[in-house]
């Protein structure tokens, strides 16, 4: 069965796993999902991730992070979707919660946070907001 929006599926699996306090969540792997997981790890929203290959299929296993029994990720939501892509120039990349959260942006220079995209001077597709 094909999936219409694999990034939304990744975000939903993370959100659902954190609501039931799971330690890890496993999703089908892709280059963009690995890049998103790397940004989440660099920003401190997850403990880590590992790519596990079984034959011709690879799974991305994400270790979720909790603080005082509560999930570190309070809000994670998809912005750009297949039916309505959201592109922003370098000057109009949005801030999430006045800079307390991050927007994950895919640019010609790779997947990065909104702050890094502004510092690099590139715009791109706003994938999701994380706070």
From Swiss-Prot:
SUPFAM superfamilies: Ribosomal protein S8 (SSF56047). Pfam families: Ribosomal_S8. Disulfide bonds: none annotated. Keywords: Ribonucleoprotein, Ribosomal protein, RNA-binding, rRNA-binding. GO terms for biological process: translation. GO terms for molecular function: rRNA binding; structural constituent of ribosome. The keyword RNA-binding applies. InterPro entries: Ribosomal_uS8, Ribosomal_uS8_CS, Ribosomal_uS8_sf. PROSITE patterns: RIBOSOMAL_S8. One of its GO terms (cellular component) is ribosome. The keyword DNA repair does not apply. Signal peptide: none annotated. Part of the 30S ribosomal subunit. Contacts proteins S5 and S12. NCBIfam families: PRK00136.1. One of the primary rRNA binding proteins, it binds directly to 16S rRNA central domain where it helps coordinate assembly of the platform of the 30S subunit. Belongs to the universal ribosomal protein uS8 family. This is Small ribosomal subunit protein uS8. It comes from Paracidovorax citrulli (strain AAC00-1).
